[in-house]
């Protein structure tokens, strides 16, 4: 029974880290939210909400109705065609993350706050026409590792260090995919640091496996330069 419960928790963690958090990052950092909010105002055709009985145009209720109609027209003409579906997907992913966080141990919930901060940085970078591979690596790999650890064990500083090492390596992989400088240095140093940390923690099997993967990876890297 304990093994079945652990497998269920592991499956929920994978859903949280990969499906919910991954979707949130893709939508937050991959959608031009600020551009969608800044265009199309005022709308060419306001909305047509019905006027309340006995409402004068210059009365506060009349002014509020005109503003609501303009907002409705802007939503229909500009925002919804550009980012409406992305917004619905974002809300669905946020709801999924909230439900999974309630089902999983409470120790994982602070990670959602860290994710929200990373999402804000990703959206801000997108506004400037840039991407944020470091934030993507932290969200996908660093937080994912911590979620898996906290689901089964209390918080530990060594686990956080290992998460940073793996995120550093993932950052290098993302920079390598974008053909940016320093990618191999980040990729290799992150894995070397992770293997050294595992060896220091007297975990020879995972440390050895990671070292073997690193050796094979380094052996293939000269072909990338050519």
Label every model-predicted segment.
Residues 22-30, 118-131, 172-180, 218-225:
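C-terminal ends of transmembrane helices
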Residues 42-106, 160-165, 182-217:
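Multi-pass membrane catalytic core of lipid/isoprenoid biosynthesis enzymes
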Residues 1, 134-152, 186-199, 226:
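Small-residue-rich segments of transmembrane alpha-helices in multi-pass membrane proteins
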Residues 17-25, 92, 96-97, 144, ...:
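Alpha-helical transmembrane segments of multipass membrane proteins
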Residues 8-33:
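Hydrophobic alpha-helical membrane-embedded segments
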Residues 135-182:
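Functional transmembrane core segments of multi-pass inner-membrane proteins
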Residues 79-153:
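Intramembrane alpha-helical segments
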Residues 2-7:
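Short, hydrophobic transmembrane alpha-helix segments
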């Amino acid at each position: 029974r304990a093994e079945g419960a652990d497998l269920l928790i592991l499956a929920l963690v994978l859903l949280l880290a990969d499906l919910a958090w991954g979707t949130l990052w893709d939508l937050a950092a991959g959608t031009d939210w600020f551009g969608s909010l800044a265009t199309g105002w005022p709308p060419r055709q306001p909305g047509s909400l019905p006027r309340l009985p006995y409402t004068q145009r210059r009365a506060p209720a009349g002014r509020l109705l005109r503003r609501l109609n303009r907002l409705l027209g802007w939503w229909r003409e500009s925002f919804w065609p550009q980012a409406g579906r992305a917004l619905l997907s974002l809300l669905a992913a946020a709801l999924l993350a909230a439900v999974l966080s309630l089902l999983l141990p409470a120790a994982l919930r602070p990670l959602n706050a860290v994710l929200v901060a990373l999402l804000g940085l990703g959206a801000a970078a997108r506004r400037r026409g840039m991407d944020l591979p470091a934030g993507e690596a932290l969200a996908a790999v660093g937080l994912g590792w911590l979620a898996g650890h906290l689901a089964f064990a209390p918080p530990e500083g060594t686990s956080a260090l290992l998460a940073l090492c793996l995120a550093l390596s993932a950052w290098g992989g993302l920079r390598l995919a974008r053909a940016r400088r320093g990618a191999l240095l980040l990729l290799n140093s992150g894995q070397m640091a992770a293997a050294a940390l595992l060896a220091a923690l007297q975990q020879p099997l995972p440390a050895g496996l990671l070292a073997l993967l690193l050796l094979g990876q380094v052996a293939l890297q000269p072909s990338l330069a050519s």
